[in-house]
Swiss-Prot record:
Disulfide bond residue pairs: C104-C132, C111-C139, C263-C276
Protein name: Ficolin-2
Domain Fibrinogen C-terminal: 102-319
This protein's domain notes: The fibrinogen-like domain (FBG) contains calcium-binding sites that may be involved in carbohydrate binding.
Length: 319
């Protein structure tokens, strides 16, 4: 059916009115050619309201795992946890070989060396023997220039010096009082170079004197700690040791003297007895004058055989 001109005009007006009325919300208008000059304008309506949400679909199959991402920055450390229980004690390992001693390599060998290092106080120090064995010794840093290693001291009679061979070999006594350093130690000390000897004595009236020798050494146990003594250099106490030079050491249980009887037993000491002695500094502590003969702390050349000294110290110093 072909619309007349009047009808088309009316329809055009209606469409235009509708288009103007809805221009604010649905502006899209399409014009289609019909035939010739007759055109039909078609208005596209506004979209309708969204429909209701459909039901949720089923989950798809699990995909392949993706590649790991870059590591993140480390987080802050958390608070320290409580201390755990102590574990069981492990098995003790085998004892290793003894390594070289740094102290032996650089440590002092004598009291004189300690003095040169700036140790000026008399007292007990650790030195190192030639075999690297540490030894605690009394260093006299005051007498005659200092640097003396004391190996015998008698001061009050609190220590028994009438002892056997093993005791004199190992040493005995107290750092606080009287002692014998031990023949093995004295041997080790006196075989490292030349050592001078000083004997200091004091009586019970406050008098002090000494005797000094150019060298002093004792040999090892195999040689019965034989005494090798140098020349007497002087001192008001006189020389009461030269007669013991080249003698072997004797104790109450090992008689190595040149007498017919055991001088150590006879004179209650231990010494380098010949037949028998002119000194007995390891004898009985008899406190001054005594009626018994030559069995005290005796040094004949100063006060004879019937006087036992209050103080006796024997000491060596490396020359």
């Amino acid at each position: 059916m072909v619309l007349g001109s009047a009808a088309l005009f009316v329809l055009s007006l209606c469409v235009t009115e509708l288009t103007l009325h809805a221009a604010d919300t649905c502006p899209e208008v399409k014009v289609l050619d019909l035939e010739g000059s007759n055109k039909l304008t078609i208005l596209q309506g506004c979209p309708g309201l969204p429909g209701a949400l459909g039901p949720k679909g089923e989950a798809g199959a699990k995909g392949d795992r993706g590649e790991s991402g870059l590591p993140g920055h480390p987080g802050k450390a958390g608070p320290t946890g409580p201390k755990g229980d102590r574990g069981e004690k492990g098995v003790r390992g085998e004892k290793g070989d003894t390594g070289p001693s740094q102290s032996c390599a650089t440590g002092p060998r004598t009291c004189k060396e300690l003095l040169t290092r700036g140790y000026f106080l008399t007292g007990w120090y650790t030195i190192y023997l030639p075999d690297c064995r540490p030894l605690t010794v009394l260093c006299d840093m005051d007498t005659d220039g200092g640097g003396w290693t004391v190996f015998q001291r008698r001061i009050d009679g609190t220590v028994d010096f009438f002892r056997d061979w093993t005791s004199y070999k190992q040493g005995f006594g107290s750092q606080l009082g009287e002692f014998w350093l031990g023949n093995d130690n004295i041997h080790a000390l006196t075989t490292q170079g030349t050592n001078e000897l000083r004997v200091d004595l004091a009586d019970f009236d406050g008098n002090h004197d000494f005797a000094k020798y150019s060298s002093f050494q004792i040999q090892g146990e195999a040689e019965k700690y034989k005494l090798i003594l140098g020349n007497f250099l002087g001192g008001g106490a006189g020389d009461s040791l030269t007669s013991q030079n080249n003698m072997l050491f004797s104790t109450k249980d090992q008689d190595n003297d040149q007498g017919s009887s055991n001088c150590a037993v006879r004179y209650h000491g231990a010494w380098w007895y010949s037949d028998c002695h002119t000194s007995n500094l390891n004898g009985l502590y008899l406190r001054g004058l005594h009626k018994s003969y030559a069995n005290g702390v005796n040094w004949k050349s100063w006060k004879g055989y019937n006087y036992s000294y209050k103080v006796s110290e024997m000491k060596v110093r490396l020359i």
